[in-house]
Amino acid sequence: MPECDWVLERPVPAITDCHFYHTMDVPGHGLVHGEWDLRGREEEYLGGVDVSGKRVLELGTASGHICFWMERMGAAVSALDLSGDQEWDMVPYHGLDLGRRIADRQSHIERLNNGFWFAHAAFGSKARVHYGSVYDMPEDAGQFDIATMGSILLHLRDPFLALQRLSGHVGETIIVTDMRPGLKCRVFDRIGGFLGIRPLYFLPDAGRCEPIDTWWRLSPGLIAEFLGIAGFPDVRITRHRQKLQDREIEMFTVVGSRR
């Protein structure tokens, strides 16, 4: 396992070198536009969990909107994310120029990291970041009360391994937020529930070579089972909507707690 190298601050990048995943009101700058606008719905996104006074580990902070919101709510936040030095879990379609796709994604991630540090300075954030793979959570990363995984598992080749590696660092609660499966998937979920089966939907399509960066649709029941196996058996599921560009997207949050 790698050692945990926490980054506390970086030189503030030029905004022209930034990409913002979240729409945010950045102090001293104003509104920046991103794909997701979670403003005013952060509490629902986190399943109503009170983070005040808690040590929180956020996996996949992206532009940091949820990170900075949790700080304003009184949490001490640490984040784990990718940098341009790590590879996204791309789907390795045969015949696809995966090397070019990986290079393009790494360049995009660097701009995303820049957006985080631009906002980090503007908000006066004290959050720290470790850059690395979720599969290789450093043993010396420390212990946290709460961990959050916002729209992360669907992008991972092995979502359970990531959750398992995370679980040893969390003492109280893991919060998993994801996109709600579509109508067809929900029908199969109901049938699966009746049969005692927890469906997992594989999204990559060899004929289209798409999607390139998303592997799964996970049902709330499956994530609840993941959490139970990992030692967080007291589970609560909530549903909500969030804004993705100009659309309202159905989401769910699974909160798993230790006994």
PLM feature segments, named:
Residues 124-134:
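Conserved SAM-binding strand-loop segment of SAM-dependent methyltransferases
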Residues 76-82:
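Conserved SAM-binding motif I beta-strand of class I
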